Amino acid sequence: HIAHHTLPCKCPICGKPFAPWLLQGHIRTHTGESPSVCQHCNRAFA
């Protein structure tokens, strides 16, 4: 529980704390951005 309070990065949208390597993926939950797109059907995936 204490580790949750000492995480160094906070989401600029909702303020939740995250480790640096998880923050970018979390921000995608707010923006709807998907990093990968299928070349065959153009469907986006995380």
Swiss-Prot record:
A zinc finger (C2H2-type) spans 1-4, 9-30, 36-46. It comes from Lithobius forficatus. Coiled coil: none annotated. This is Escargot/snail protein homolog. It comes from the Eukaryota. GO terms for cellular component: nucleus. Belongs to the snail C2H2-type zinc-finger protein family. It is found in: Nucleus. Keywords: DNA-binding, Metal-binding, Nucleus, Repeat, Zinc, Zinc-finger. InterPro entries: Snail/Krueppel_Znf, Znf_C2H2_sf, Znf_C2H2_type. The lineage of its organism: Eukaryota, Metazoa, Ecdysozoa, Arthropoda, Myriapoda. GO terms for molecular function: DNA-binding transcription factor activity, RNA polymerase II-specific; RNA polymerase II cis-regulatory region sequence-specific DNA binding; zinc ion binding. It holds the Pfam family zf-C2H2.
